[in-house]
């Protein structure tokens, strides 16, 4: 929570006791000494005689009470020898097996000592009114990069008049995987001089969302934005609709093409099918186009698709705008980043005066990848004791049969080794420790994105104890406002995307997450050097936390701060790196001195 103190009733009691003593002393010293003296003398004499008469009885009573207390202590240690050991270790190694006095689960905590120091540091920082330096980008060079994948000075694609056939894409996964698939399909269509049909989204047993492209993105805007780069239509011509793609050899699955395939592989394997049949259907299409080597015009086209052509439909924009206004408590125009995501819904009714006069709430968006599937698949341990191990093992057996088969054939890896190698998802407790080490005060608003956190309230307590202002879209929007999104997980994920991308600070716990990658790329592209992202290294953090029994808070702060600052260094996109995550390259952005 950051703030500590005593209950009001305790304070009142202490004050009344102090006032009573002061009043008594004033009464004694301010009274008539002669009158008071006779009273005191008589009282002291009577008390002295009474003590002499009953001295033996008093001594015997105290001796008997001492003996009974000693006997009780001895009997307790005989019949419950483990009580002392258990109570002393519970703060550091709390288990989800334990319950509180009211029947609720205790906090599952792995770093009780560090959490205690973090709480004290937050109180001290609040008293000093210190503000974290990580509300801003660490390096000024971030501001010299600007979006330019849609620049108009580039020549129009010369091959638009030629059409080698149609490309139909059925993308799998959730919102973010489908977004990548769409932009990869745009690049492939351009590469093969083909016409792209508006992509379709497959129904997933995991996401259980029937949404199609037009339910999430603006179709006409998508086609208009890319009209000078690739031909796009909403449907196949009638003479191709009736074809059996599998029978004629036009059905292409993940088994037919490499993950992150090169342009050469598409020309060698896919182009002949396209010329022969006039159509190719990519079924279950996803991350099937590599980043290097790739012609610069195709790389730029992927950036243009992701950062400019894919705009959410008005229903999502309007609710996203409402969500942001309720977090920030403002209703005026904001940054280029907000405009791109919210469109015309960026403006709203003013509260009082101009935008500058409104008290704005700054917030951190935190994407916790601590869902049960992620936790179970990692094979790590998270301080939850026997119940946690049993639950996760049962989940693995039910949901990951291939993983279980592989484990039977491979050498087991210890939980300690998994953690030290950076293969364990960060817990809510670890996220809280990182934020407190970076100087964010306990009154910071944190928007929590993602699905259900494994362990529920007991797992979240170490985070909410330090940062009580934790909010979700379900907290900020009414059931009526959320009703149009019910049973549409991808559309709900779009609201999280908006809240994370437009946040003052975006904190990720898993750099491999598609949401984290796409959001951090969006913030780099449109942020103008004013949209910092916190990327902790799981391996480095595990090394720091391994010293949790001995490390000082000052040392912990310094090492975590260095880790985050180094990750914010302004770098060009490296060879083979994703333009969806790292768009700082000459194909996507322009550098102005």
For every predicted segment, state its role.
Residues 1-54, 83-100:
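Short, low-complexity, Lys/Arg-enriched N-terminal segments of secretory-pathway carbohydrate enzymes
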